[in-house]
Amino acid sequence: MRKIGIFGGTFDPPHYGHLLMANEVLHALQLSEIWFMPNRIPPHKQHEQVTKSEDRLRMLELAIADHPRFHIETIELEREGPSYTYDTIRQLLSMHPDHEFYFIIGADMVEYLPHWYKIAELIQLVTFVGVKRPGFSTETSYPIMEVEVPQFAVSSSMIRDRVRKGQTIRYLVPECVRLYIEERKLYGARKSVNSR
């Protein structure tokens, strides 16, 4: 049985914090692979503007290209409407009955578990992995495995904000992602500022 870590998110854009978290969980739990799973419309972000799926997918492909055990699962991008983890995990289990899935969430999402769609059924299908973050607790009544990860205080929203303000994002995202953002003028990028 293969142990697969599922790392869902908008990845708008993917950054070194995502890669660090995925790599630490991969090794801490001795997983076979990490599958990054970009969502089309996450239920908790239905009213936020999200960058086009094609751009987010391409940035993710670029970001993980050099890691042999990182892969992308596009099942949620292909589904219309909001992406519910319960539906996704059921579909993945039917496609890969020989896999055991570990769903990776940051400590900031642990407190929302009681509000997740069909959470009682979901915890029977998948093992949740809570990654500790400063200022958030991984304490919950639901069974989760905890993983300590070195802190890297960066977020996708902070990166988008820095790009909008014309500030550098070098060393916050892989260089290939930075160049893609610049080339596609995502988040209001201006080449002359972001090249620094």
Curated annotation (Swiss-Prot):
It catalyses: nicotinate beta-D-ribonucleotide + ATP + H(+) = deamido-NAD(+) + diphosphate. It comes from the Bacteria. Pfam families: CTP_transf_like. CDD domains: NMNAT. GO terms for biological process: NAD biosynthetic process. GO terms for molecular function: ATP binding; nicotinate-nucleotide adenylyltransferase activity. Its EC number is 2.7.7.18. Keywords: ATP-binding, NAD, Nucleotide-binding, Nucleotidyltransferase, Pyridine nucleotide biosynthesis, Transferase. Pathway: Cofactor biosynthesis; NAD(+) biosynthesis; deamido-NAD(+) from nicotinate D-ribonucleotide: step 1/1. The keyword ATP-binding applies. Catalyzes the reversible adenylation of nicotinate mononucleotide (NaMN) to nicotinic acid adenine dinucleotide (NaAD). Belongs to the NadD family. This is Probable nicotinate-nucleotide adenylyltransferase.
